[in-house]
């Protein structure tokens, strides 16, 4: 396997011809191995917080912090502690003995407290994406914002060591900040992908010669190799656009699947897979840490302490790999942001900040107007709205179903999470192989993922068939049945995450990557409210979580015709044509300004 020292230095190809400059000061240096691994490093850093924090231990920590401060709704006895009833803290208390906590004059269920916190976090995250992410397309903001979100987010996870039950509300504040930084950083990270692909030597050769001369991304034993990266030289962060290599304008790819899309898909898939690898590793370490600390006297007297140690570990991991990203990933500056110059005085700085936020909201509106002129972008975003809603709804419903109807323990739910995560890791590596083996276009691969995803709700609905219900098995009637479905969920999610992100990247007008990925993320987060709300209403109406599978089955099918209609090559050419014909020229850089 290649060593870190080998990865950190990759000689530049002597015959590499840089692409044409879209604006003054653009860095068109060839993409090297170190820069690609710097991009991977942040995914490895933040995916751990997404899976181990947001997806597993943060909800448990919030609920337990509130529970230790709460009381039973009817008897007003403590939920935990020596005076608590034996069944109060283990999930077997009757409904009228729910654990509640006083907050702002109300008595809130401790589980609902965690749900409300994450709902607020998603809302704040969406506002932050709009306010700041569009600025990443300008000057050196792209890398600066990525690192700022990474270090602030990791700090919120580590600060949970200081949160004790009497100040459980501060834990909610940390969650809101952490989730906001997580989502915002991924938007900025995604905006690097089209730029890295555009400056890759193999893509430039394929464009210049009108060939599909791509990297051979493969695995030989344990060695990961990309053929054209073996001889590159990474010239460092200070490599500028000027140089001895002639700047040339790429020609249009002649194939139905562009070199950019193929390489983008492969890099994206590997990035998702490496993120899942890191998440599984830290999740296993976290479970071992929880098991060890829970046996100590301190862990028994302070139930949240083991969970807070896990969040400390997650935060340290996030910060450490963000440092690696800061060393290896180039800034890739955008064009100057005209009219926004930081002032010297305090008041002037506030005025500049307000102008920046106002500009970001205006930029979002401009992004929407530009997107509406690109048919493939509109169709894809409509499909992505439904796909992301389905993923979020299936995840939430599955956990709720496992706890309430299959009665899985917390450890079993954790193992279910690891199963899905490991499957997602395998899926991220598997889908590119499947796509190459059967010569599938990106949208066809997404359609195959959606078809497999439909297995989950269909299997859950089998229990509505009388003779299957009488068997007492199949249709999610036994706890073990949810684990194979967890594998399906993971494999499909890994494919959808990488292929949807990569396909959308090819539809974006060059120079507007961060703004369009902010719209991509806003579509994702905006849809996350819809499905869970409808499933919740169905549960209230029927008293059964299983009824949610009916809605999920329909929801998963809805985006299929839209995905089928997306033509990636036509969308890419439309985006390039829009940039070339944009007024005020400089190739329309900065959202076609």
Swiss-Prot record:
Q: Where are the transmembrane segments?
A: 42-62, 112-132, 159-179, 181-201, 271-291, 305-325, 377-397, 415-435, 448-468, 480-500, 525-545, 548-568
Query: Can the keyword Transmembrane be found in this entry's annotation?
Result: yes
For this UniProt entry, the molecular function terms from Gene Ontology, in alphabetical order, are: transmembrane transporter activity
Q: Which residues are glycosylated?
A: 90, 443
State the residue spans of region: Disordered.
Answer: 228-261
Tell me which domain of life the UniProt entry assigns to the organism this sequence originates from: Eukaryota
Q: Give its localization.
A: Vacuole membrane
What keywords are annotated for this sequence in UniProt? Answer: Amino-acid transport, Autophagy, Glycoprotein, Membrane, Transmembrane, Transmembrane helix, Transport, Vacuole
Q: What does UniProt give as the signal peptide span?
A: none
Biological process (GO) annotations?
amino acid transmembrane export from vacuole; autophagy
Q: Which GO terms describe its cellular component?
A: vacuolar membrane
Membrane topology annotation: Multi-pass membrane protein
Q: Which family does the entry's similarity section mention?
A: Belongs to the ATG22 family.
Q: What does this protein do?
A: Vacuolar effluxer which mediate the efflux of amino acids resulting from autophagic degradation. The release of autophagic amino acids allows the maintenance of protein synthesis and viability during nitrogen starvation.
What name does UniProt use for this protein? Autophagy-related protein 22-2
Q: Which organism is it from?
A: Emericella nidulans (strain FGSC A4 / ATCC 38163 / CBS 112.46 / NRRL 194 / M139) (Aspergillus nidulans)
Taxonomic lineage = Eukaryota, Fungi, Dikarya, Ascomycota, Pezizomycotina
- What gene is it encoded by? atg22-2
């Amino acid at each position: 396997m290649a060593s870190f020292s080998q990865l950190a230095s990759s000689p530049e190809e002597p015959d590499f011809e840089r692409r044409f400059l879209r604006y003054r000061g653009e860095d068109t240096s060839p993409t090297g191995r170190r820069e690609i691994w710097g991009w991977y490093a942040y995914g490895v850093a933040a995916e751990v917080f997404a899976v181990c924090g947001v997806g597993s231990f943060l909800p448990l920590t919030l609920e337990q912090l509130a529970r230790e401060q709460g009381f039973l709704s009817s008897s007003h006895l403590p939920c935990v502690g020596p005076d608590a009833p034996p069944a109060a803290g283990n999930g077997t208390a009757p409904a009228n003995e729910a654990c509640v906590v006083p907050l702002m004059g109300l008595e809130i269920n401790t589980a609902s407290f965690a749900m409300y916190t994450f709902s607020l976090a998603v809302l704040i995250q969406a506002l932050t994406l709009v306010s700041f992410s569009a600025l990443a397309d300008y000057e050196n903001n792209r890398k600066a914002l990525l690192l700022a979100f990474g270090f602030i987010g990791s700090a919120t996870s580590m600060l949970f060591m200081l949160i004790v039950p009497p100040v459980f509300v501060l834990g909610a504040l940390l969650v809101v900040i952490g989730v906001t930084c997580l989502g915002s950083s991924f938007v900025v990270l995604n905006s690097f992908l089209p730029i890295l692909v555009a400056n890759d030597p193999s893509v430039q050769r394929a464009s210049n010669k009108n060939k599909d001369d791509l990297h051979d991304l493969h695995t030989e034993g344990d060695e990961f190799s990309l053929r054209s990266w073996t001889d590159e030289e990474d010239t460092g962060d200070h490599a500028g656009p000027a140089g001895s290599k002639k700047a040339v304008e790429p020609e249009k790819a002649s194939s139905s699947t562009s070199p950019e899309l193929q390489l983008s898909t492969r890099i994206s898939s590997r990035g998702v897979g490496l993120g899942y690898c890191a998440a599984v590793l830290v999740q296993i370490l976290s479970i071992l840490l929880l098991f060890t600390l829970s046996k100590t006297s301190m862990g028994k007297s302070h139930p949240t302490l083991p969970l807070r140690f896990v969040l400390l570990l997650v935060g340290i991991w996030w910060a450490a790999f963000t440092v690696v990203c800061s060393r290896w990933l180039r800034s890739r500056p955008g064009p100057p942001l005209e009219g926004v110059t930081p002032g010297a005085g305090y008041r002037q700085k506030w005025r500049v900040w307000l102008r920046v936020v106002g500009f970001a909201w205006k930029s979002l509106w401009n992004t929407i107007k530009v997107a509406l002129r690109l048919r493939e972008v509109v169709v894809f975003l409509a499909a992505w709205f439904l796909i992301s809603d389905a993923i979020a709804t299936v995840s939430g419903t599955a956990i709720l179903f496992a706890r309430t109807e299959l009665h899985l323990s917390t450890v079993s739910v954790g193992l279910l999470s690891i199963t899905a995560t490991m499957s997602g890791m395998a899926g991220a590596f598997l889908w590119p192989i499947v796509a190459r083996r059967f010569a599938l276009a990106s949208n066809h691969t997404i359609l195959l993922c959606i078809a497999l995803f439909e297995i989950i709700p269909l299997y859950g609905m089998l229990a509505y068939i009388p003779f299957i219900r009488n068997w007492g098995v199949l249709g999610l009637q036994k706890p073990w049945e949810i684990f194979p479905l967890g594998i399906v969920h993971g494999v499909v999610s890994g494919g959808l995450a990488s292929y949807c992100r990569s396909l959308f990247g090819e539809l974006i007008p060059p120079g507007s990557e961060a703004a369009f990925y902010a719209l991509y993320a806003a579509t994702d987060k905006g849809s996350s409210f819809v499905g869970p709300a409808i499933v919740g209403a169905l549960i209230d109406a029927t008293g059964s979580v299983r009824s949610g599978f009916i809605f999920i089955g329909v929801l998963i099918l809805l985006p299929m015709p839209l995905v089928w209609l997306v033509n990636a090559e036509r969308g890419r050419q439309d985006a390039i044509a829009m940039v070339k014909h944009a007024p005020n020229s400089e190739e329309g850089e900065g959202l076609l300004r």
